[in-house]
Amino acid sequence: MTTHHLVVQSPGLSIDQAEQLAALAQAQGVARISNTAARLLDVQHDADTRDEVAAWADSRGVDAAFVPAGLKLSDCKVLAMDMDSTLINIECIDEIAGVAGVKDKVSEITEAAMRGEIKDFAESLRRRVALLKGVPAGALEQVYADKLRLNPGAERLITTAQSAGLKVLLVSGGFTFFTERLRDLLKLDSAHANTLEIENGLLTGKVLGDILDADAKAVHLREFARAHGAAQDQIIAMGDGANDLKMLAAAGFPVAYHAKPLVRQQTRFALNVSGLDGVLNWFES
């Protein structure tokens, strides 16, 4: 049986918390990774132990992940990320809607779609984009400059992954206006999203071409992985919403990042309180 470690982390992780989890998982030792993370060595990882650890950690705001011992970041070849509310702090379409004065209407649809309550993502996107008809195209730049920020740990995760030889893919059900700028800013290898139609400096309320939905996200990831010779167990994928589930299922290391309950329930790994760079603590140097 493969030896597993339990990596625990949170912004306020205490020695006492690490020791309690070590006892719960019958760890053979504790190695401090940083002041916010620890690796509990050679733990029990049967289903009952996993459930007990998950319940304990969730109730105390601690991220916990069972990982094979000796795992190295360089063993992976691809890092794939969603954009809105994963790589960045906002849902871009909601902020564009704010400029148009229809944020409440658009946000309601966005939230329902991300929770998985609206099964047809393409239709939900068309409904939301239609509400943006007549918005000046300059609103996109306004959102990018004033509202959009990288989520904590984004730059460290990406630069460390790139240094370890991973190729980085950004694939989003959002818009190319933002993904292309983030691709250039972070020197990503590839980025895909939907393109808003603009005529005479105004949004028309339409998306050009096919909608990049959950199925398309998974296809882009598989094609990118194939191009870079990555097997499924060499792929890290991160997302937060229901439209990320198929992409996450295509990865050996699927990560629900500050995600909706539906996504956390169906994903092997989760970061609920840590930054994006919390992923790095799962790998040994």
Language model segments and positions:
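Non-catalytic pre-domain segments flanking phosphatase-related domains
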Residues: 1-81
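Short beta->alpha junction loops/turns
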Residues: 11, 46, 85, 175, ...
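A diffuse structural propensity rather than consistent per-protein peaks
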Residues: 14-18, 136, 213
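Exposed alpha-helical structural elements
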Residues: 20, 48, 52, 105-108, ...
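Alpha-helical substrate-recognition element adjacent to the catalytic core
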Residues: 26-43, 63-74, 86-196, 215, ...
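C-terminal cap/substrate-recognition subdomain and adjoining C-terminal extension
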Residues: 51, 139-285
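Asp-based phosphoryl-transfer active-site loop
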Residues: 77-92, 240-243, 248
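Residue-level marker of motif borders
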Residues: 77-79, 111, 235
